[in-house]
């Protein structure tokens, strides 16, 4: 089992939670293919909207990958992003970036946020998960 962070606006994360899916890196297939059934994904949201909105700077969702299927979904005539099915946990408390900064591995992960999708340790994932589920 592996643990991942996806970066997306809170609005987009909430659409995924409601629909039971994840998308990362503007719908690219390759990052999704690295995840396997049973892996966990934490979503970090810098803002409420994709190109605008208020600062969020928090982990806003956590879920487990359902199967090994990566599929395309037609959102618009010229936009068919790739998705994975996810069972999201009912995580009542978004985890602010300040809590993530308390973890010793945060410095190395902070630099990777700009990539939109990256692997993290079980320990870091648990640090965030415990806060979200408290």
Report the location of each language-model feature.
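Short, polar loop/linker segments at the starts of domains and inter-domain junctions
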Residues: 15-24
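Short, well-ordered loop/turn sites that connect or cap secondary structure elements
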Residues: 35-36
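Amphipathic alpha-helical interaction surfaces
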Residues: 44, 68-71
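Short beta-strand-centered aromatic/proline hotspots
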Residues: 52-68
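Short, charged beta-turn/beta-strand-edge "cap" motif at the junction between a beta-strand
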Residues: 45-50
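A generic "cationic amphipathic patch" detector
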Residues: 19, 51-54, 76, 99
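Contiguous surface segments at macromolecular interaction interfaces
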Residues: 1-5, 10, 24-30, 70-134
